Amino acid sequence: MKFWYSSTSPFARKVYVTILHHHLEEQVDIQKVQVAFDRNSPHNQDNPLGRIPAFQASSGEWLYGSDLISQYLDELGQEVSLFPNGMDKWHVLNILSIAEGILENTMPIVAEKFFHEKEHWWKDRHQQIEERNVRSLALLEKLATEQGLSLNIATIQVVALVDWWNLREEVIGFSLKENFPELQDWTQKMNATFDVLQASWDF
């Protein structure tokens, strides 16, 4: 099995934490991608989506999307599943969807600010996304902190979101530390509690 990841990608981090949680490091060839946009990068050669994370199963089949990859690895692993069963499953997956939605809203803006001059930014769209994010982050803060210090696929993604946001705060132009201190405090406690979260983030 092969796994291509970027050290800053919150989606790739979720997969990486799943690998670490289930002690699959010896079974998965973990490849760090320096430039995800490089068309010559191995993950872009056979993967039509050309997105990070990228994963190739031992059969040679490509798996697309961080949730699918994480669930595949979770089923291979022997540790406690990161995907709960029963009615808890839908609550956890709902939190996961909120965190992913915030990332999907925000990451293109970060890329736009990185690669385009300010006069070419879509500022009205940025304002609209920021308003959505504020509402979504308020909900996420409530739901995530209600989970307590528990490790599941949703809390992993929320931690990855917050740490990534803090890394890109200057570019995003909005502080989670100032506006959502409970979410920030919860994230710090999660990182301090679970070694796999610490091991998956070098910033």
Predicted regions and their residues:
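Short, surface-exposed recognition loops or helix-turn segments adjacent to catalytic cores
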Residues: 87, 151-153, 201-203
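Surface-exposed helix-capping loop/turn segments at secondary-structure junctions
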Residues: 79, 142-150, 194-200
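GST-like fold's C-terminal all-alpha helical module
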Residues: 99-186
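Long hydrophobic alpha-helical segments typical of transmembrane helices together
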Residues: 177-203
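Non-transmembrane alpha-helical segments in soluble domains
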Residues: 70, 74, 93-96, 137, ...
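GST-like domain detector, emphasizing the conserved glutathione-binding G-site
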Residues: 1-123
